[in-house]
């Protein structure tokens, strides 16, 4: 395939379209396929050749694809992105004209994926040249992908087999990748609503559902909806292909903090298996109620946690660590009326700086308000009075 002529290539394209062979047509327009490295196909002006073989709008679509291979060959991703935009626009015209059929869905997947990739590359080139701010091209790409999404979502054909709605989840996942990259998570909301109300939501491919749950789980985590986040991220982790160690590790980076906030600590074996030992000391610190160790562990791996976007989530573990430390005080003193001084001593032992009785009251008030401690503070007697039943409820019942 690497060195076929332009005429042979266009003949293959013609036959794929004529026979409604979506998979073959997708390969012929995808940058994952080796034909893009063929110098014979990298053309600056292929329009005339394409018009001789292909009907509109396919002539325009594949001419843009050949110009795109030419641009990529010259490492000009700004031009490649422009060409890819034309490809998607002309594809959309053809796709809408295919009434009551969805054979071209694989083609849409190929051109949509390349659009996102080239938008990202173009962004980087433009930012280096000082011509645009980060995310401008990705934002424009998202608008075009939304046009594709609308075409799929509005296909109200009766026959589900031939419905374009099968393309919705792939596009949503591409849009999620963009929105997370440009930090516009609020734009995910209408897409989540559309998928959750779709009668196909459980019938999409496992791979697409795993990607979807991964992003929706991450969004739930940022929204502090930890139970929902645990459900989605656990689904993604359990259904992710066992050979995809890298993807499973990526899911765990977000699932671990969520699980820890719900009181489920990971084993050292799990952390070793997925090369996530950065969490080991954090886990130990939270379990032991060791504030000093938690502070040190977060500081030690701060760069990694910030890069992953979980540092602020992990900081929420501080309140859980207070809870675990204060539970130890309760277990040690074996009484339901606990002197506030006992908590002050525990905090000073953990080298918490400038702590006084007012701060102890403030921490305890927070723990009571959040449901981590069942009880009340008796200011008159300077005591914490805890419930005789389950004074420290399991974290999973609280968050």
Swiss-Prot record:
Cysteine pairings via disulfide bonds: none
Matching InterPro entries: Csn12-like, PCI_dom, WH-like_DNA-bd_sf
MF-aspect GO terms: double-stranded DNA binding; RNA binding
Modified residues (N-acetylalanine): 2
Annotated PCI domain residues: 210-391
Modification Phosphoserine occurs at: 45
Subcellular compartments: Cytoplasm; Nucleus, Nuclear pore complex
Keyword check for Acetylation: yes
GO CC annotation terms, alphabetical: cytoplasm; nuclear pore nuclear basket; nucleus; transcription export complex 2
Single GO BP term: positive regulation of B cell differentiation
Keywords: Acetylation, Cytoplasm, mRNA transport, Nuclear pore complex, Nucleus, Phosphoprotein, Protein transport, Translocation, Transport
The family this protein is said to belong to: Belongs to the CSN12 family.
Subunit field text: Component of the nuclear pore complex (NPC)-associated TREX-2 complex (transcription and export complex 2), composed of at least GANP, 2 copies of ENY2, PCID2, SEM1/DSS1, and either centrin CETN2 or centrin CETN3. The TREX-2 complex also associates with ALYREF/ALY and with the nucleoporin NUP153. Interacts with BRCA2. Interacts with SRCAP chromatin remodeling complex component ZNHIT1; the interaction results in inhibition of SRCAP complex activity, preventing the deposition of histone variant H2AZ1/H2A.Z to lymphoid fate regulator genes and restricting lymphoid lineage commitment.
Its biological purpose: Required for B-cell survival through the regulation of the expression of cell-cycle checkpoint MAD2L1 protein during B cell differentiation. As a component of the TREX-2 complex, involved in the export of mRNAs to the cytoplasm through the nuclear pores. Binds and stabilizes BRCA2 and is thus involved in the control of R-loop-associated DNA damage and transcription-associated genomic instability. Blocks the activity of the SRCAP chromatin remodeling complex by interacting with SRCAP complex member ZNHIT1 and inhibiting its interaction with the complex.
Protein's name in the database: PCI domain-containing protein 2
Species this chain originates from: Homo sapiens (Human)
Originating gene: PCID2
